[in-house]
Amino acid sequence: MEILYTEITQDLTEGLLEISLEELEKNRKVYYIVPSSMSFEKEKEILERLAKGSDSAVFDLLVTRFKQLPYYFDKREKATTKTELGTAGLSMLFRRVLRSFSKEEIPLYFSLQDSAGFLEMLIQLRTELLTANLSVENLPDSPKNQELKKILSRFEEKLANDYANYSEFGDFTSRLADGEFDFQLKDVTIVIDGYTRFSAEEELFIESIQDRVARFVIGTYSDENSLTAGSETIYISTSQMIGRFRSKFPVELRKMAFSSVNEVYNKLTKLLDLDSRFAISDQNIEINSADAKYFRIWEAENQKVEIEGVAKEIRQKISQGAFFKDFTVLVGDPAAYEITLKEIFELYEIPFFYAQEESMSQHPLVIFFESLLSIKKNNYGTDDVVNLLKSKVYTDVNLDEEVIDYFEYYVQKYKISGRKKFTEAFNESEFSKIELVNQLRENLLGNDSPLQVFLGTNRQKTGKKWVSDLQVLLENGNVMANMNTYFSEAESENKHQMADKHEQVWQMLISILNEFLAVFSDEKLKSVEFLDILLAGLKNAKYRQIPANVDVVNIKDYELVEPKTNKYIYAIGLSQTNFPRIKKNSTLLSDEERLEINQTTDENQFIEQLNVVNYQKNQFTVLSLVNSAKETLVLSMPQIMANEQGEFSPVFQLFLNHSDEKILQKIQEVNLFESLEHIGNSRSVISMIGKIERELVETEEKNDDKRVFWSSIFRILVKSNPDFQKILLDLAKDIDTVNLSQETLDQIYGDKLYASVSSFERFYNCEYQYFLETTLGLETFENIDINSKIVGNFFHEVFEKVMQEEALSAENFDEKLTKVLHDVDSNYSRYFTHDATARFTWTNLEEIVRQTATVLKETVSTDELKTLLTESSFGLPKSELGNFSVDDIYLRGRIDRLDQLSSDYLGAIDYKSSAHSFKLQDAYDGLSLQFMTYLDVIKEAFPNQKIWGALYLQFKNQPINLSEINHLSEIAGLLKESMRYDGLVLEEAADQIKAIENITVKKSNIYNQEEFEQLLKLNENHYQHAGQRLKSGQIAINPIMKRSEGIDQTGNVRGCRYCPLKSICRFEANVHMNDHSREIGQKSQAEILAELKGEGRNE
C-alpha cells in the first residue's frame, strides 16, 4: 500500500493521474475510485485531463466508486426469482414487520408502525450497521434497543428468507479475502482520490485487496506536522486514517511536492490551521489589497442582490472569453436559493445545472394518488375532488378543460362535499352548465365510475387484489393513456427533460407496485392503508439528474465542494447559521451509544460518532472551500436571510481580521458607478431601469455624469430592442381601459338601462367594478358567514313574515316569532350545513334575530309608528310600488318596511347586517344612493302624502363586557340602548320621530323640505351621470380614494378594500393611485349644503 499526501493547496488529482498514466503504460487496468457524491464531476474532469494525451489511455482507466467494483469482477448471473427491494420496498417490509408485533412486545415503537419518519430512521440505522460491519447484537442493552433488536432481527429474517437483498459489496469483500479474484487482480492498479476517512466496510475491503493487486495507491491531504500533532490539526481525519493503516500493514508513506501555489489560498489555509490549533504565528499573515484579485468577501443587501452580483460577474467574464463551465456556484442553503437563483440566471441568460435533487411529489401522477388518498380519508372533500380532476391524469375521453372549471365553480359555489353529494345528480337548475357538470360528475365520480369502483368499498382486500383493482382504475380512468399522451407531447415539442420526468415517474410507480406485491401480496389491507403505502414511496422519490449541456454553470451545495473544483468559485448564502453547518444527531442511536459500541467491538467494526465526525467534516469542508478555486474565490453573505438579520460566520470574521479593507465588498441592488462591463445583459438592465431611475433622482446633484451614462444606455436599448420600446410606451397606460363600441353597447344595454340601486353604488365606488359585476355578471364565491347575502335574506324573510302576521301585538310577538323562525329555518337549512363556518353562523342567527326583535316588539307596541308594507318592491314584475325610472334608467329594489307615523307621514326602514348610518358626504359622492332613492320611490308612489325620512336597523347580537356593569339587571338596559334605529329625518317630522323609543337622530341628519328636495335632485343627477357614462362606453378603473386615508395597511385605497377583482384590473395603489383613482370626502357638510342651494354640482 502506498499513501501519497500533499497539502490541500496542491493539485492532488494531477499527481494521481501521473501515477495512473504510468500504470497504463505498463498495460495495467486502473480503477480510479472517487467519493460517490462527486463521481460524475470527477469522471468528467479526469477524462478531460486525459483527453490531452493518447485516446487509448482512457479505455483502460475506469473512474468508479467502491460499491461499483463488484460489477467489474463478478460476472455471474443471479439465478433467483426473488425480488430485490429498493428503499421504498425496505420501508414497506419494515411497516409489515412492525404490524406483526403486539403492543406488549414493542410498547415504545408500536404506535409508530405507520410513521414515515420512523420507517426512514429504521432504514438509516440498518444501513449504518451494515456500513459499520455490525449486527443488531452490537447495540447497547437498553429497553429502547431491546425493541430495536426485535424489529431488526425479524426484519433480517424476512429479508433473508423471501427477498434477493444482500450486500454485494460485503460478499465481494469476503470472496476477495478467500482469493477468488487473485488472477483477475494481478494486473490491476487501484487509485483512491479524495478520501480523508473510510467507513468500516471500506476499510475491510481495502485490507482484503491491497496486497492482491499490482499497485494500491491512496492519495489524500495532509502535511508533516499533522502526522505527528495528534488532534491539534486541520487534517485530523487523515492522520487518524493513516495511523490505523500503518498499524495494520506495511505502508509506503510519501509526500507529493508541487511548485506552483497561489499564495492567497495558502494564507487562508494557514489561518484555518492556526485557528484549529489555537496557535499564534510568529509571522503576521495578512490578506492584502493585491490579493483581492483572487479572494473577496461580499456583504450583500439580500439574497436577490447577492445572486445578481454573481450573475453580473459571470456575464462580464464571459465577455472576456471565459466559458460557463469555468464557473461553480456553491450555495449555503440550496432549497432557499433555488427559485430566486434560477429566475435571475434565466434573466441574465446564463445556462446552469442546479444539483439539487428534485422531488417527484409535484408530478400530476403523484398528485392524483395524493388526491385519491385524501378523498378516501376526508370523505370526498371539495378541494380533494377538485385537485384530483385538476391533475388531468384521471379524465373522461376528450374531457374539455373548461368543463373542469365549470365543475369547480359549481362545487365551490354550492359547497358540495361528501361521497353522497358527489354520487347523486347535481340539482341546482339555475346553473347554466348543469348538464355538462352532471355528465362529468356521472362519468368520473358517479356510482359506476372507475373511481367509485376502486374506492367504493371499506372492506379489506389482499395486496394482490388492490394492485389488480388499481390497474383497472388506471386503464378505465384513462390514467395510462394520459401519461402516454403527456410523454408523446413532450417528445414532439423537444421537451426531452419533461418527457424523461414523465417516464421516470411511471417507472417508479411500476417499481413500487412490484415491491408492494413482493411484501404485501397476501396481506389484507384497507384502501387507505394501500394508498398510504403506495404514496409514501412516490412522494419520497427523486428524479435522476443529468446535466443537459457540458458548457453550463454548476450550482450545488457547498458541502459537496472539493479542492481545485473550478477556475471561478462563488460561495453564496454563507451565514453564521450554516457556515459551518451544525447538524444534530436525529438518528435512533445517541452519540453516547455510538461511543459504547466502538469501545466494545472488534477490529474493522466501528460506527461513526456523529458529534465527532460532523466537526471533522465541517473543518475539512471549510478547508476544501477556501482551496476550491483555481483563479478567483468569492465568499458571500446576505445581510437579510429568511427575513432575519444575517451575521458573519466565525470563518468570515477570522479572514476579515487579517484582511485589507478592500477584501470586504458591499454589494448593492443599484450601483450607479458600475461601468458598461458590469451591467450584465440588456434584459437585466431593462428589469432594473425603474430602480436606476429612482436612484438617479434621489442623488441628482452628485451624479450628473452618471445620468449621462445611463441615459445613453437606455437610448441604445430603446433603439435596438422593439420589445423594450413597447414596454416603455405601455408603462404609462398599463391599466388604461378601452371604450366599448356602439355595437357592443347596443347588445349589452339597448335603449334602456335596467339595474339595481346597489349596483350604482358600486359604480361610484369604481366604474370597472360595476362593469365586471353588473354588466358582465361576474360572481365571486360567497362563504356563508354573518355578512353573506344568504344570511341577509334569512333575516329579511324572518322579519317580513313576523310583521305580516295577523293581530300581531307585543303580547304575542315572541310566540309568533318562534313559529316564523321554525318555518324559515326549514327553508334555509340546506345553506347552513355546507361547512363549519356556515354551521357556526346558523347557531348564532336565532340569538341575533331575538335581540333585534326587541326593537321590533317596541315598534309593534307603539301607536306612533305603524308598518304599512314589508318587502315592498319597485321596478319588478307585480311590484307594489310600481316602476321607478330616472330618464332611461329603470331601477329595481325592495324596501324592507314602509312605516307610517300617526300624522300620516311615510318613511322607509332598511335592515342591515352591518353598521350603517346616513352620511351626507357619501350621498354627495354617490356612495349612498339607497335612502334617497327609496324616499323618491315612496314620494312618487304616494304623491299626496308627506315624507318623514328613512332609518337603518342593524341586525346584531351586541356583546356586553360584564366587568363594566355593577348588577345583572343592567344588561337588559344596555342591550336595549345598543339596538337603535339611525338615519335621516325631515325637520317637520323630527319631533314626532325623536319621541319614539329606540330611534336616534343626529342633529346633522335633520333636513328641511328644501334641502330634502335638493338631495333628491342630487340623487337623480348621480343616476343621470352614471347612465351617460355607461351609454358612452366609457369605463374607467377609478376606485375611490380619500386623501386623508391614503393607502391602508393592506396596501389598498378605500375603493379596493373589499374588492375581490384586483387580479383582473391589476390596480396597484402605490403605482396607480394618482392617475386612476377618484378622490372623495373633500368638502364639509356646510359646503355641500351651500353648493346644493347654489348652481348644483359639477360632475
Curated annotation (Swiss-Prot):
[4Fe-4S] cluster binds at residues 766, 1056, 1059, 1065. NCBIfam families: rexB_recomb (TIGR02774). Keywords: 4Fe-4S, ATP-binding, DNA damage, DNA repair, DNA-binding, Exonuclease, Helicase, Hydrolase, Iron, Iron-sulfur, Metal-binding, Nuclease, Nucleotide-binding. PANTHER family: RECBCD ENZYME SUBUNIT RECC (PTHR30591:SF1). Coiled coil: none annotated. HAMAP family: AddB_type2. Its cofactor is Mg(2+); [4Fe-4S] cluster. Its EC number is 3.1.-.-. InterPro entries: ADDB_N, DNA_helicase_suRexB, P-loop_NTPase, PDDEXK-like_dom_sf, PDDEXK_AddAB-type, Restrct_endonuc-II-like. The heterodimer acts as both an ATP-dependent DNA helicase and an ATP-dependent, dual-direction single-stranded exonuclease. Recognizes the chi site generating a DNA molecule suitable for the initiation of homologous recombination. This subunit has 5' -> 3' nuclease activity but not helicase activity. It comes from Lactococcus lactis subsp. lactis (strain IL1403) (Streptococcus lactis). Binds 1 [4Fe-4S] cluster. Gene3D superfamilies: 3.90.320.10, P-loop containing nucleotide triphosphate hydrolases. Signal peptide: none annotated. Belongs to the helicase family. AddB/RexB type 2 subfamily. GO terms for molecular function: 4 iron, 4 sulfur cluster binding; 5'-3' exonuclease activity; ATP binding; double-stranded DNA binding; helicase activity; hydrolase activity, acting on acid anhydrides; metal ion binding. Despite having helicase-like domains, this subunit does not have helicase activity. One of its GO terms (biological process) is double-strand break repair via homologous recombination. Heterodimer of AddA and RexB. The keyword Cell cycle does not apply. It comes from the Bacteria. This is ATP-dependent helicase/deoxyribonuclease subunit B. The keyword Metal-binding applies.
